[in-house]
Curated annotation (Swiss-Prot):
Species whose genome carries this gene: Silene latifolia subsp. alba
Residues with Phosphothreonine modification: T39
Post-translational modification comment from the UniProt entry: Photoregulated by reversible phosphorylation of its threonine residues.
Cited SUPFAM superfamilies: Chlorophyll a-b binding protein (SSF103511)
Quaternary state and interactors: The LHC complex consists of chlorophyll a-b binding proteins.
Protein name: Chlorophyll a-b binding protein, chloroplastic
Length: 205
């Protein structure tokens, strides 16, 4: 009886361990990479979404327009100019704001990066971003990367032309579809740059 119980226990232990051993075997064959997914609450369940979300004046807010349903981030029920009344206009404005935020994040990186380079031996006329503009009034002026052979910042027209050409080319490339082809969301195309696999789960993304 004891022997039978021990054998059954051992068999049960092997059964319980089998999935784990199978997982270990598969992980070992895939270089130790495990794809894990978890369920994340959707945005409408948050207090910041839906009809009961906080309003811009709290309890003193006026009647919220019917087209502001709390579906999108930042919707506090305020649209006196009616900019979100037309769905197509709202979609276009939302696209522009997302792009503006991305340019702003890139600009924030551009504020910090020159200081990091300056601390590691790269010479700038002025690496601190809020002081760099004053260099335009100095005798030597302001050059990109401190190199006079590059675009000279004394010429406002040259700066303007560079901004229009460089940023306009990138934006035109994005609006035209870029390398991703058609049928993808222009704001969140996914797949182009996702080394951490953060967009693999549509619900989590």
């Amino acid at each position: 009886m004891a022997t039978s119980t021990i054998q059954q226990s051992a068999f049960a232990g092997q059964t319980l361990l089998k999935p784990q051993n199978e997982l270990v075997r598969k992980v070992g064959g895939n270089g130790g990479r495990v794809s894990m997914r978890r369920t994340i609450k959707s945005a409408p369940e948050s207090i910041w979404y839906g009809p009961d979300r906080p309003k811009y004046l709290g309890p003193f807010s006026e009647q919220t327009p019917s087209y502001l349903t709390g579906e999108f981030p930042g919707d506090y029920g305020w649209d006196t100019a009616g900019l979100s009344a037309d769905p197509e206009t709202f979609a276009k404005n939302r696209e522009l704001e997302v792009i503006h935020c991305r340019w702003a994040m890139l600009g924030a990186l551009g504020c910090v990066f020159p200081e990091l380079l300056a601390k590691n031996g790269v010479k700038f006329g002025e690496a601190v971003w809020f002081k760099a503009g004053s260099q335009i009034f100095q005798e030597g002026g302001l050059d990109y990367l401190g190199n006079p052979n590059l675009v000279h910042a004394q010429s406002i027209l040259a700066i303007w032309a560079c901004q229009v050409v460089l940023m306009g080319a990138v934006e035109g490339y994005r609006v035209g579809g870029g390398p991703l082809g058609e049928g993808l969301d222009q704001l969140y195309p996914g797949g182009a740059f996702d080394p951490l696999g953060l967009a693999e789960d549509p619900e989590a993304f």
